[in-house]
Amino acid sequence: MGYGVAQKRAKVTNSIAKVSEKTLNVGANANPAQALAGAVAGVKVDITSGSPSATPSITIRGGSNYDGGSNEPLVIVDGVIRSSLSDINPNDIESMEVMKDAGATALYGARAGNGVIMITTKQGKNGKASVSFNAKVGLNYYNLGYNMCSDEDYLYYYRLALQNCEWTLPGGKYASAYNSNLYGTNNPGGIGRTELSQGQSYNILRKTDDNAYLLQKGWSEMLDPVSDNYILYRNIDPLEMNGRTPYVTQDYNASISGGNDRGRYYASLGLYDADGFIKGTFYKRYNFALTGSYKITKWLESNSVFNYTRSNWLNDDPMLDTGYFMNRGQAFKFVRYRDEDGNDLYGTGGPTTNVNVNNGNFDRDFQADKFSMTQSLTATLLPGLTLKGTMSWYYNEEYDESFNHQYINSQAGAVNPNGNNGVNRSYNTSASFSRYFDQTYNLVANFNRVFAEKHTVNVMAGTEFYKRRYRGFSAGGYGAPTGYFPGLGLTQNDADVQSRSMSSFHNEEALLSYFGRAEYDYMDKYLFAATFRADGYSRLVNNKWGTFPGVSGGWVFSKENFWNKLGMENIINYGKLRASYGMNATINSSYLGYYTLQGSYSAYKYDGVYGYRVSTLPNPNLKWEKTRTAEVGLDLGFLNNRFNLGLTYYNRLTMDKYSALSLPRTTGFSTVTYNNGQYRNAGIEFDLQGTLLRTRDFQWTFNANITYNKNTIVKLPENGLQNNRQGGSEVYTGNGDETHYVGGYQEGQTPGSFVGYGVVKMARSQADIDALGDYIDTGVSNGAAVYANEAGRQRLLAMGYTNLVQLMPGDFIYEDRNGDNWVEAKDRKVLGNLTPKWTGGFNTTLTWKGLSLYARFDMGFDFQVYDSNIAFWLGEGQGAMAFNDAVRDTWTPDNPGAKYPRVVWASQYGTDNYIRTNSFFTQNGSYLACRELQLSYVLPKSICQKLACQGITVSVTGQNLGYIKSCTIPLPDHTTYTSGNTAGWGGTYNVPRTLLFGLNVTF
């Protein structure tokens, strides 16, 4: 329950879920949060990146923010508040509890508005020393998630896409405006280049007798579908240049523990070493933990916990832009990464860069060191009365350093690295250092007694002081005379060239708290608890103090005499009704920065004079963001607790939530943080655990949960607009010219909706177009206007449109919602919502003798996703994108019944079948994901004894094995959302599939 107060499960009157040690340690996870997906009702884990250093996001019961604020719960490890779970070794965790309702989390007051994750690390146990060694080695397989089309198919459809464009390209009808090296310019045949030059960017040529020899050097040929020429081409997969698959993850842990009646100890060492998909990227973490307890006297006990973590990482290559994984599948084929003699070339930049040309040219050193120490003394003053004093220190230091030697940044530099073209010699160098130090001191008294063998009283009271000091600086520069030394002092910095920059920051915050909890139960049947906390927070200037009460109660009706008289005890042996109500707050909000309330300042120079100005507008009157939660629940045990069922209804209201208010530009500020209304999450949680089958040698157990959650914006500040809306789009309701606003944020609406055009059908033939009359469409992404016939064209001209494109067979016909035969922005509608209404998961274990099969799944239902990737590829959004295999099912005169519209080069400048958000690419996002599947075997004791050990377990595990889904996007549990108007799968760093081999030995 927190602050060292233990409580029996049967007496718990709040929503507290415990995560098993097995769940946390089946796979190789850099972050324990990865193992929570689908493990706890009401907890949603978004694993949004396959980067080995990625930090999953955790949301409990829908969170308290919908507009960009943090929904992360409070993380407490051995009494120490942590910023995240990222530096915690899962192998050191003894127990993890998720506190969800305010009746429980009110004890942590101002920081627990999004729930609490409480972790207790392993402690020593009485007995002789036990030594354990655990090793896991995994092979990670990169998964793009789409089947891209073959080289020949790509060229075939790309050339048709050029032929289908209705406008004149700068270089001729069949020439690509993307790059003159690709197809040539001013050439009606479309492919002008016939000679292969060293500096050429693409392996594309028009075949001639002089270059036919390339067919003997790995090139291929095909007939150009729009001319009588043959095309020579050679493709080198960017994966071969920049990536690696499989790539390796290693996880090693060793521990020793033991103890006796006077003292106990536990010590561990851990190494987690994971390569990334991009060559040279990695995440490495070293862990050391030491815990000990010692009875100084009969009435005084000491407990000590020490943890140290060092992390090193490199997340990406400097030459690959941040959009690499978005563009990895989109990148144009046939980039010239290597010449015919096997020499590396540069490529074309961005996602199509060959990182091998710059091996050793970039120095990167990113390192974080984290220490935590907790020391407590517990004194037993009287029977049942204890006094515990605890001090906790948490130190987090990060140092980042970067230096660029001479490096190649174009194809010309790869051809001639000693020349002046395509070579960067600016020798950029930078370094940054940050440090924060958290101190927590608390004193807690606890009284626990049983009176007359019926009345149990447990009272706790305490006070706590928390302080954080955060310091840091950064500096950078360029223009050093040499690339051999990375010193900032060598960079050029004179009156003509100011190449150096530097900054620093100094921040502090403090929290003073008083808290207490009282529990009473009568004969384990009637349960009551009350919690109170008062917090004073330094950042809230005029509203420092907040109070956070919580109450809960329970009735174990299965202990009543009438239950036995009904004869139910043999079926439902345990039954408890519970209810709770409480309040807490959120101060770990991303909106509540160090300078949010008092303002910040920056230097400036005007007319030769230096001064300073306010750069962040302060808001000293900001109030506490409070969360009020009420819940009722029912816990049942069946067949002597062989099966256990839990049902909970919760209703959580976030009041005075933090948000950023946009300000007029005339104020000189972009935003100010303010209290922005009320937000409600309400839902139902179901938990079911049990043993399906048990014999002497065989056992089958399972654990399942599912949650329904609905979130609603209840109240926004009065602004005179409909539903006090913030943002949104005006659209027709479907009732004539009547309009309303959708998207954005509005009272009474659910955030997460996205807006787009409804697709009526695809024009399969000219007859479908002729039936449209004077139909016009001005909803094109880039300002063009579409007409069906001459009457529509004249209509557009009269409206002032000049960039006109005719609707063709193979194009979409969009929904006209007000009946004026004109598709415009107001004809859009809500296409779906990106937030699953139902989430959950289940795991199951089948054990036969020493053999065990374990599987873990999570799921989400009743929501929509938008596949913007296929739309962007087939729409040729930048004029030169790759195609996935859906291109084979696009409309052509020979395939009028195709699923997808015709492919047109740079579709957004034409009829825009693909780039604009529409209902065609809106899909059901429901999914079932297989997170882990493990087969393990415990060797017989007779074999272990011969090997001088107590136990040996070997295992093979598959992680992130895939989804059962109907949508086309690879990760239906990860979508993007912006103000209710746009949606899509952004093409992130996909989570890899992993094959993991494990060994655990205990001595």
Residue ranges with predicted function:
Residues 77-80, 99-102, 111-115, 248, ...:
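Short, glycine/acidic-rich beta->alpha junctions
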Residues 42, 51, 264-266, 848-868:
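Glycine-rich phosphate/pyrophosphate-binding loops
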Residues 229, 410-412, 495, 537, ...:
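Extracytoplasmic gating/loop element in the C-terminal half of outer-membrane beta-barrel translocons
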